[in-house]
A protein has these predicted regions:
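Acidic/His- and Gly-rich active-site-bordering loop/insert found
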Residues: 1-87, 106-113
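Acidic/histidine-rich catalytic neighborhood of metal-dependent amide-processing enzymes
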Residues: 84, 90-166
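Acidic-enriched catalytic cores of C-N bond-cleaving enzymes acting on peptides and small amides
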Residues: 140-141, 154-155, 165, 184-201
């Protein structure tokens, strides 16, 4: 559970599970620890370097729970009436598990075409400082960032298929502009600061 502190998350447990899942397959496995217990895992199925690579990236952390508000045990992965209940079942461990299963299947069958990588990334729920940011800054060549598929997040309507081409985030800036004070009733011919900041923003 990632409570937004560096010592939480403990994604090493999921990295261990994923590494065991790939035992006996012809893959390359690398682990990257950004902070004690905060492990991202990269599983690579080597392919033809002349062909396009593909990276499947899923995160392995989940957010905390307010357990009294849950009607099912949040960490038991309970299957009831064909439905899986648990923290992370929707965001996004079901996608991460599916990506791992597809990668293992392709590794077992061989010949992926281009190189296929599966990444179980730590620290997505806390903006990725110990996950994607760490990997991009400290280990940018651990896998191909080109043709990288990840989550769309949350739940969707049945039959809906969502695609994101980017990720929104906070980018706070302080802008200073200088101009004349004025009144909205006489806007013409004035050097209004609000007009300048509108052009910048």
């Amino acid at each position: 559970v990632n409570d937004l502190t560096p010592d939480s998350g403990n994604e090493v447990r999921n990295a261990d599970t994923l590494e065991k899942f790939f035992e006996g397959t012809d893959v390359e496995i690398a682990r990257y620890e950004s902070h004690p217990g905060r492990v991202s895992i990269v599983v690579t199925v080597p392919g033809d370097p002349e062909k396009e690579p593909l990276t499947l990236m899923g995160h392995t952390d989940v957010v905390p729970v307010d357990e009294p508000k849950w009607t099912k045990p949040p960490f038991d992965a309970l299957i009831e009436d064909g439905k899986l209940y648990g923290r992370g079942a929707v965001d996004m461990l079901f996608i991460t598990a599916s990506m791992a299963a597809v990668t293992r299947k392709i590794a077992q069958e061989g010949n992926p075409g281009g190189t296929l990588a599966f990444v179980g990334m730590a620290d997505e729920e806390a903006r990725g400082g110990l996950g994607v940011k760490f990997m991009s800054e400290q280990h940018p060549d651990a896998f191909s960032w080109k043709n990288c598929l990840s989550e769309t997040g949350g739940s969707h309507l049945p039959g809906a298929l969502g695609f994101n081409v980017g990720e929104k985030g906070a980018g706070q800036r302080r802008l200073h502009v200088h101009g004349d004070a004025g009144h909205g009733s006489t806007p013409y011919g004035k050097d209004f600061a609000i007009l300048k900041i509108g052009e910048v923003a």
